[in-house]
Amino acid sequence: MDLISVILISIGLSMDAFAVSITNGAMISKVTASEGIRIGLFFGGFQALMPLIGWSIGIKFESYIAALDHWIALILLSIIGGKMIYDSVKENQDHKDEIACDYAAGEKKCLNNKTLILLAIATSIDALAVGVSFAFLKVSIINTIIIIGSITFVICFIGVMIGKKCGKLLKKRAEILGGVVLILIGVKIFIQHTNILSYIF
């Protein structure tokens, strides 16, 4: 597989993570470069790790993974997205959700590592399936995952910064929008993998 193909695959795989990163940047009250780097590292790291796992598993479990990846993505994204929507509209603020933390200047929202891991896994499921195909293609897996991880990191960092600008306009609605975006991404992955629209139209 040539370098251009690997780069195009990397960009394609990072699009869901890019959309989520924009949402994260809009949702977080205090967005800094270090926060963008942290989010980028999580998404880039898992986007690189998943193909490696898929490559290791190989062709033996290809059909099994293809049958479940869309369900895993749909369930994870729907749960996280639904929780974000619920937490943004509930009246009782005594119990803060897991994506809230305190800054010295006051209470600000940020994404904790647990939430980022779940988001990173959910948006890198496709990369796991692609990694399986790498097992029987002539690719340098180490070089490939480095490229995938690096491109995803850069794209997600940019996404967070874009979200930071949008967040000034979205304000309190950012979390609701974020939840909707996550659910829609999950539905999109599900539709793409099941071809359900072909049965309707």
Swiss-Prot record:
<keyword id="KW-0813">Transport</keyword>
<dbReference type="GO" id="GO:0005384">
    <property type="term" value="F:manganese ion transmembrane transporter activity"/>
</dbReference>
<comment type="similarity">
    <text>Belongs to the MntP (TC 9.B.29) family.</text>
</comment>
<dbReference type="Pfam" id="PF02659">
    <property type="entry name" value="Mntp"/>
</dbReference>
<dbReference type="InterPro" id="IPR003810">
    <property type="entry name" value="Mntp/YtaF"/>
</dbReference>
<dbReference type="InterPro" id="IPR036259">
    <property type="entry name" value="MFS_trans_sf"/>
</dbReference>
<dbReference type="InterPro" id="IPR022929">
    <property type="entry name" value="Put_MntP"/>
</dbReference>
<comment type="function">
    <text>Probably functions as a manganese efflux pump.</text>
</comment>
<feature type="transmembrane region" description="Helical">
    <location>
        <begin position="65"/>
        <end position="85"/>
    </location>
</feature>
<feature type="transmembrane region" description="Helical">
    <location>
        <begin position="141"/>
        <end position="161"/>
    </location>
</feature>
<feature type="transmembrane region" description="Helical">
    <location>
        <begin position="116"/>
        <end position="136"/>
    </location>
</feature>
<keyword id="KW-0406">Ion transport</keyword>
<keyword id="KW-0472">Membrane</keyword>
<dbReference type="GO" id="GO:0005886">
    <property type="term" value="C:plasma membrane"/>
</dbReference>
<protein>
    <recommendedName>
        <fullName>Putative manganese efflux pump MntP 2</fullName>
    </recommendedName>
</protein>
<feature type="transmembrane region" description="Helical">
    <location>
        <begin position="39"/>
        <end position="59"/>
    </location>
</feature>
<keyword id="KW-1133">Transmembrane helix</keyword>
<dbReference type="GO" id="GO:0140048">
    <property type="term" value="P:manganese ion export across plasma membrane"/>
</dbReference>
<feature type="transmembrane region" description="Helical">
    <location>
        <begin position="176"/>
        <end position="196"/>
    </location>
</feature>
<keyword id="KW-1003">Cell membrane</keyword>
<keyword id="KW-0812">Transmembrane</keyword>
<dbReference type="GO" id="GO:0030026">
    <property type="term" value="P:intracellular manganese ion homeostasis"/>
</dbReference>
<feature type="transmembrane region" description="Helical">
    <location>
        <begin position="3"/>
        <end position="23"/>
    </location>
</feature>
<keyword id="KW-0464">Manganese</keyword>
